[in-house]
Amino acid sequence: PSQTLRRFQILKDLLGHVADDEIIVNQPFYCDYGKQIRIGKRFFANFNLTILDEARVTIGDDCFIGPNVSIYTACHSTDPVERNTRREWAEPVTIGDNVWIGGSVTILPGVTIGSNVTIGAGSVVTRDIPDNVVAVGNPCKVIKKII
């Protein structure tokens, strides 16, 4: 089989759901389990995508992810005594349809990014982002409505 077909089969076996064969994930790609990751149609990820899928990560149709993006679902206490007990929990991340995530973006646990959204390069997404906007910064904030 072709290299493209082989890569698709590996991703299909690794991930919880892949909507179609129009998926491109450049290497390297890192994840915790894979089975918690659901990817929609016509997905593209540039190199060095990291997804810590302790909880479900859902990515909609027609999404593009730049290089060096990290998506985290794992949470730890900010209290040092509790943190030292190694207690961990997870919160899901949801990314809507038609989303472009720029390079070196970090998406934190429990975040929902709406549809038709652009997240600017280098942003740290700490809270939900609504549909139809451009959002940038650390912390990531809406700077423009689109559509």
Stretch-by-stretch model annotation:
Residues 111-114, 129:
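Extended beta-solenoid/beta-helix repeat architectures
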Residues 125-126:
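Short hydrophobic beta-strand element within catalytic cores of glycosyltransferases
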Residues 29-39, 44-112, 138-140, 144-147:
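Flexible, glycine/small-residue-enriched loop-and-beta-strand segment within the central core
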Residues 100, 118, 134-136:
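Short-chain dehydrogenase/reductase
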Residues 1-22, 140-143:
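Terminal amphipathic alpha-helical/low-complexity segments used for targeting or macromolecular assembly
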